[in-house]
From Swiss-Prot:
<dbReference type="Pfam" id="PF01582">
    <property type="entry name" value="TIR"/>
</dbReference>
<dbReference type="InterPro" id="IPR000157">
    <property type="entry name" value="TIR_dom"/>
</dbReference>
<keyword id="KW-0520">NAD</keyword>
<dbReference type="GO" id="GO:0061809">
    <property type="term" value="F:NAD+ nucleosidase activity, cyclic ADP-ribose generating"/>
</dbReference>
<dbReference type="GO" id="GO:0007165">
    <property type="term" value="P:signal transduction"/>
</dbReference>
<feature type="region of interest" description="Disordered">
    <location>
        <begin position="202"/>
        <end position="236"/>
    </location>
</feature>
<feature type="domain" description="TIR">
    <location>
        <begin position="13"/>
        <end position="180"/>
    </location>
</feature>
<dbReference type="InterPro" id="IPR025886">
    <property type="entry name" value="PP2-like"/>
</dbReference>
<dbReference type="GO" id="GO:0030246">
    <property type="term" value="F:carbohydrate binding"/>
</dbReference>
<feature type="active site">
    <location>
        <position position="87"/>
    </location>
</feature>
<protein>
    <recommendedName>
        <fullName>Protein PHLOEM PROTEIN 2-LIKE A6</fullName>
        <ecNumber>3.2.2.6</ecNumber>
    </recommendedName>
</protein>
<dbReference type="InterPro" id="IPR052147">
    <property type="entry name" value="PP2-like/Lectin"/>
</dbReference>
<dbReference type="Pfam" id="PF14299">
    <property type="entry name" value="PP2"/>
</dbReference>
<dbReference type="InterPro" id="IPR035897">
    <property type="entry name" value="Toll_tir_struct_dom_sf"/>
</dbReference>
<keyword id="KW-0378">Hydrolase</keyword>
Length: 392
């Protein structure tokens, strides 16, 4: 047990680094030293802490999608694991899309044995392939990933190497720090160039309002209504909850679906209520084809937190991304503390503000609310949808 005088460092919040590995031996003798070293260097690293408790594969694949860099720790027993090979196939997919940088680590196994499926590494794969011959499309993806990923520039540690694991880990940390720094510089340059085509407007901080989290804070608001030319009010364009991609929303023990009527004779609105989860992820998309070019719009999650809501000690992350027709993208990230809204009525949680590009270059707007803090189970969040409305 740590002494009461020990200093607890804040959790890193930079680009996520996903680690794919296999086996208790690798975890005990390598990963258990690598991960603390990365976190000590303020690198935001994710590993499957619940490897032996049957973590859901969908959660791990989502983690890969949220990562910008992946470390694949190839060891002799790597190819004995369905889980690792499924992760590897997803890593290859993201790499091929240009969404993920991959560093293969050859831990006491030859790079050639991995790439050409030689020795025990290859024997393990062929045995797994035979046992799953009825799953040919999946095993083919495994094989393609095993051929592709080792081709990236990696770092080998031979079985009989005179180099210590500690020395090897230190060199890994330095390499990863350099990569993350280069990624940050490249991203800033890309954003500056892309703003000539699509403007993303960061949320403004109200005067006199401090943000305890250190980022830009925009207070949640009650959903607004716009006046029509006839003087009546109309509800802003809404992406309903059912059209959002809410992780685990199909599982009644985690989310409950119900309907509400906000006014007499009004249409029913379907809402999703969070029962209890560790990982929260809600994603929605729209295209700009039906929006006014050059106009500024905001995307806000319309939610409320019930009186018994809990598990919101850490803020949620909000991301708005504009993906252009040529695959380029720009984005804004911010955080919001939902604890402040427990027991209130419907509020708007700002995802971001964007300027619509010309009709000739339409874009897809992706808005995300997520929080992967696995220390607290979250409950009591009610989701109505995401409102898209013009701003002044």
């Amino acid at each position: 047990m740590a002494s009461s005088s020990s200093v607890v460092k804040p959790t890193p919040t930079g680009p996520q680094v996903f680690i794919c590995f296999r086996g208790a031996d690798v975890r005990k003798h390598f990963i258990s030293f690598l991960v603390p070293a990365l976190r000590e260097a303020n690198i935001n690293v994710f590993i499957d802490e619940n490897e032996f408790l049957g973590s859901e594969m969908a959660n791990l694949l989502t983690r890969i999608e949220e990562s910008e860099l992946a470390l694949v720790i190839f060891s002799v027993d790597f190819t004995r694991s369905h889980r690792c090979l499924n992760e590897l196939a997803k890593i290859k997919e993201r790499k091929d899309q240009g969404r993920l940088i991959v560093i293969p680590i050859f831990y006491k196994v030859k790079p050639s044995a991995v790439k050409f499926l030689e020795g025990k590494f290859g024997d393990n794969f062929r045995a797994l392939e035979r046992n799953n011959r009825h799953m040919l499309p999946i095993t083919q993806k495994w094989k393609e990933a095993l051929e592709s990923i080792p081709g990236s520039i990696g770092m080998p540690l031979a079985e009989q190497s005179e180099r210590t694991d500690n020395d090897f880990i230190n060199s890994m940390v330095i390499k990863i720090q350099q990569l993350l720094e280069n990624m940050a510089v490249r991203r800033n340059n890309e954003i500056e160039a892309q703003r000539k085509l699509v403007s993303i407007v960061p949320p403004k901080k109200p005067k006199g309002e401090a943000n305890p989290q250190g980022g830009s804070m925009v207070p949640a608001r009650k959903p607004e209504r716009e006046a029509s030319q006839e003087g009546s009010s109309v509800v802003p364009s809404m992406v309903p909850a059912r059209d959002l991609d809410i992780t685990h929303s199909e599982k009644p023990q985690k989310w409950t679906w119900s309907t509400i009527n906000e006014a007499p004779n009004s249409a029913e609105i379907e809402i999703a209520t969070l029962n209890k989860v560790y990982w929260l992820k809600i994603v929605g998309t729209i295209t700009t084809e039906n929006l006014t070019p050059g106009a500024k719009y905001e995307a806000v999650f319309v939610v409320k937190l019930e009186n018994n809501a809990s598990g919101w000690e850490q803020p949620v992350n909000l991301k708005l991304k504009v993906v252009q027709h040529d695959g380029d993208d720009d984005r804004v990230d911010r955080t919001e503390n939902l604890n402040d809204y427990i027991g209130q009525n419907w509020v708007d949680i700002l995802a971001g503000v964007f300027v619509v590009p010309p009709k000739t270059t339409p874009a897809t707007i992706i808005f995300t609310m997520y929080q992967y803090e696995d220390k607290y189970k979250k409950k009591g969040l009610v989701v109505k949808g995401v409102a898209i409305r013009p701003t002044n």
